[in-house]
From Swiss-Prot:
NCBIfam families: PRK01192.1-1. It comes from the Eukaryota. GO terms for molecular function: mRNA binding; structural constituent of ribosome. Pfam families: Ribosomal_L31e. It comes from Arabidopsis thaliana (Mouse-ear cress). This is Large ribosomal subunit protein eL31x. Coiled coil: none annotated. Belongs to the eukaryotic ribosomal protein eL31 family. Gene3D superfamilies: 3.10.440.10. GO terms for biological process: translation.
Amino acid sequence: MSEKKGRKEEVITREYTINLHRRLHKCTFKKKAPKAIKEIRKFAEKAMGTKDVRVDVKLNKQIWSKGIRGPPRRIRVRVARKRNDDEDAKEEFFSLVTVAEIPAEGLSGLGTKVIEEED
């Protein structure tokens, strides 16, 4: 029998479009941007299967760019599952969420895209 690597054990990067409008519906105005960050963390945790999710500063700035009440309706993010080099870490992997470049045509029609690592 050949040994197969598990789905959760490989280092991988994917691009997703997250519909924040759907996730923030019926949310109080003054809680929208913090809830958007929490929803992005929840999405990345589910997509990559890691408990340790780190949000990039640029992504945080983009969510908060129009204030606490006006996060973007949709956002294109790049989620990377990386190996944790820290010896005393609880998890073997962590997820890093960054902002992906939005094409000129807009977000419609974009699906999930696997990004090849350039090492």
